[in-house]
Regions:
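Glycine-rich ThDP/TPP pyrophosphate-binding loop and its adjacent helix/strand module
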Residues: 149-256
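Hydrophobic alpha-helical segments, chiefly the membrane-spanning helices
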Residues: 266-272
Length: 272
């Protein structure tokens, strides 16, 4: 499924929010995998976590595969841990990234217990949102990345979103965070490969010249900004290499070193 969807995403490039990309991926996944139990903390329409194939679990009818948890992120996260502990089921639940603080105790337990729980966190920046600074995450990503045995993914387009979901589902002993945008993003992947590049942690998406003056590392929505900035700098003969870094987990360290070989005189910038 994932390889076919990646190929289709490259052949049909569109400006999409990664929350929408996640919904498209989930539509394909829930059609095939009936062990996925979805849900949201009263934000299903904003998180794009419910698919057309899913049936809501209701009082007196537990045959469904989607839970409306209500406005209670902490309760949702604890219930997802319980579902994962039961076995043979993969729970995922959605909220805004700013509300990950309410989920934090259960996220830590997911990591400690080595359970495959997937947290879909949307509206992941100050880029777009009608609710103002109370709903704009700033320090949350750093806090989540500091938790051992937790995948934190911030994809930059539809292809990366598919790859992050693929990696999260294969991480049988590690919970995952998918940090997703509300605003639309231009596609960054132009050519198809069977390799899941997001599993590498970091990889090159643009090089404006063989002689590089600046390497820009970016994730999520800022990859688009890094690419746009690189093209503008090239007009002033300042040449850049852009590295998409959807994950900062240890698996990426080796690949990060590979991007340090151009020259020790090359400046490096982390944009997020």
């Amino acid at each position: 499924m994932c390889i076919r969807d990646r190929r289709n995403a490259i052949l049909e490039p569109k400006n999409l929010a990664t929350r929408k990309c996640s919904e498209m991926t989930l539509n394909a996944l829930t059609k095939q995998n009936h062990n996925l139990i979805g849900g949201s903390a009263d934000l299903a329409g904003s998180n794009n976590t419910k698919t057309k194939h899913q049936k809501i679990i209701k009082p007196g009818d537990f045959s469904g595969d989607y839970i409306h948890y209500g406005v209670r992120e902490h309760g949702m996260s604890g219930i997802m841990n319980g579902i994962a502990l039961y076995g043979n089921l993969i729970p995922y639940g959605g909220t805004f990234l700013i509300f990950s603080d309410y989920c934090k105790p259960s996220i830590r337990l997911s990591a400690l217990m080595q359970k495959r729980v997937i947290y879909v966190m949307t509206h992941d920046s100050i880029g777009l949102g009608e609710d103002g600074p109370t709903h704009q995450p700033i320090e949350q990503l750093s806090g989540l990345r500091s938790i051992p045995n937790l995948n934190v993914f911030r994809p930059a387009d539809r292809v990366e979103t598919i790859e992050c979901w693929e990696h999260a589902l294969k991480s049988s002993k590690t919970p995952s965070i998918l940090s997703l945008t509300r605003q639309g993003l231009n596609p960054i992947r132009k050519s198809f490969t069977n390799i899941n590049k997001c599993s590498l942690g970091a990889y090159e998406v643009l090089r404006t010249n063989n002689k590089i003056n600046l390497t820009i590392f970016a994730s999520g929505s800022e990859v688009n900004l890094a690419i746009e900035t690189s093209h503008k700098l090239a007009k002033d003969k300042i040449y850049c290499k852009v590295i998409s870094m959807p994950s900062m987990e240890p698996v990426s360290y080796t690949h990060l070193r590979a991007h340090e070989t151009d020259s020790y005189l090359v400046c490096r910038l982390l944009l997020e």
